[in-house]
Amino acid sequence: MQKPIIEFRNVSKKFGNKTPISKVSFIVKKNNITTLIGPNGAGKTTIVRLMLGLEKPTSGEVIIDRKLKIGYVPQKFGLTTDIPITVKKFLDLLAPSHFNKNIKEISSFIDLEHIKKQEISKLSGGQFQKVVLACSIINNPDLIILDEPLQSLDVTSQQEFYQLIHFIRKKLNITVFMISHDLFTVIKNSDQVICLNGHICCSGVPHEITPNSEFSNALSSLGFYTHNHDHKH
């Protein structure tokens, strides 16, 4: 059995009197797309901060290979969209000199060639997300963590974004860990789904989310309604 790229073992985290996550256990398999879903305040941000080493667990273990390279795209990227800089110059600034040779290949992967001369301020929401995705893979990571990457994107842009995620995962052999609120697109595009609400409510593969299943009932109790969609993956 292949060793997981990340493993949480009975992890709890306290901040003063608050315990955002309690006794959380799960694994992230190499080269899979794993999606974490849950309501606001469920502890999703705490999970990401533990993965990135920004926090240490109060109890339990977070097991990550020290050599693992991680690309991270936060929910709020922190890039002002009105800066007067082109897409190409922006990516060149981000990449260390020995990675500059990869810029053209990455731009081709993410379909940025036709917009590389445009200013950041002129990009649509979907185009901007492609730039953000390029930022996350520019240094050849083993794992990318995407925090709500589909937020504010229309349906077409969401579909295009997932197509790129699948392409990058296959082409570059990158593992993807994503946070999302959109259960329908998650079911269609993930290898593993983890539902969090301070603890792990349910976890499994998308085809297990069938009407009246334990997985489906747990999701429904948190407001994720599953019975109106075709869930074939």
From Swiss-Prot:
> Which parts of the sequence belong to the ABC transporter domain?
6-222
Q: Look up the EC number in the record and give it.
A: 7.2.2.20
Q: Which reaction does it catalyse?
A: Zn(2+)(out) + ATP(in) + H2O(in) = Zn(2+)(in) + ADP(in) + phosphate(in) + H(+)(in)
Cell compartment(s), UniProt: Cell inner membrane
Leader sequence segment: none
Output the InterPro entries linked to this UniProt entry.
AAA+_ATPase (IPR003593), ABC_transporter-like_ATP-bd (IPR003439), ABC_transporter-like_CS (IPR017871), Metal_Ion_Import_ABC (IPR050153), P-loop_NTPase (IPR027417)
State any GO CC term: plasma membrane
Which PROSITE patterns does the annotation name?
Answer: ABC_TRANSPORTER_1, ABC_TRANSPORTER_2, ZNUC
Which residue ranges traverse the bilayer?
none
The record describes its quaternary structure and partners as:
The complex is composed of two ATP-binding proteins (ZnuC), two transmembrane proteins (ZnuB) and a solute-binding protein (ZnuA).
Q: What is the name of the protein in this document? A: Zinc import ATP-binding protein ZnuC
Lineage of this protein's species? Bacteria, Pseudomonadati, Pseudomonadota, Alphaproteobacteria, Rickettsiales
